[in-house]
């Protein structure tokens, strides 16, 4: 089974797919070209399937691919030096969101975690644009 070259060298293509896959996990919906969306779909489906396994090996494989990007910052209660409770800001990363939020959502689903909606041609060059989102 082949893949699309997307007019780039292999390192550029890998970086593009990493960025778009991370963005799809973070935002759960992105707008891109049709060819890119079809390639991202393959990558994200495999990441979510490994996220459903949830073991250490799956987490390390996903960490090797997903960018170390902060999704949001949450406040948590922590103990201070004097024993009082203090509010601390703790970042939530894309990998953590994949394993804690996204993958458990699809525990009963056997594949088909993404949806591609056609949007129409891009104004500048007429490239077919789509919206890819997590179902």
UniProtKB/Swiss-Prot annotation:
Assigned keywords, A-Z: Ribonucleoprotein, Ribosomal protein
Keyword Magnesium annotated: no
SUPFAM superfamilies to which the protein is assigned, alphabetical: Prokaryotic ribosomal protein L17 (SSF64263)
One of the Pfam families matching this protein, by short name: Ribosomal_L17
Any single Gene Ontology cellular-component annotation: cytosolic large ribosomal subunit
Source organism, top-level taxon: Bacteria
GO molecular function: structural constituent of ribosome
Gene Ontology BP terms: translation
InterPro entries referenced in this protein's UniProt entry, alphabetically: Ribosomal_bL17 (IPR000456), Ribosomal_bL17_CS (IPR047859), Ribosomal_bL17_sf (IPR036373)
Family, similarity comment: Belongs to the bacterial ribosomal protein bL17 family.
Description of how the protein assembles with itself and partners: Part of the 50S ribosomal subunit. Contacts protein L32.
Name of the protein in question: Large ribosomal subunit protein bL17
Gene it is expressed from: rplQ
